[in-house]
């Protein structure tokens, strides 16, 4: 579930991991 990681990362750091 890489999308979940992206969402959490985005919410936590402010940028997306692709």
Swiss-Prot record:
Domain of life: Bacteria
Transmembrane parts of this sequence: none
Signal peptide: none
One term under GO cellular component: ribonucleoprotein complex
InterPro entries found in the cross-reference section: Ribosomal_bL33_sf
UniProt keyword annotations, A-Z: Ribonucleoprotein, Ribosomal protein
Keyword Aminoacyl-tRNA synthetase: no
Family, similarity comment: Belongs to the bacterial ribosomal protein bL33 family.
Name of this chain's protein: Large ribosomal subunit protein bL33
Name of the gene: rpmG
């Amino acid at each position: 579930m890489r999308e979940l990681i992206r969402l959490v990362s985005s919410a936590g750091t402010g940028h997306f991991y692709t």
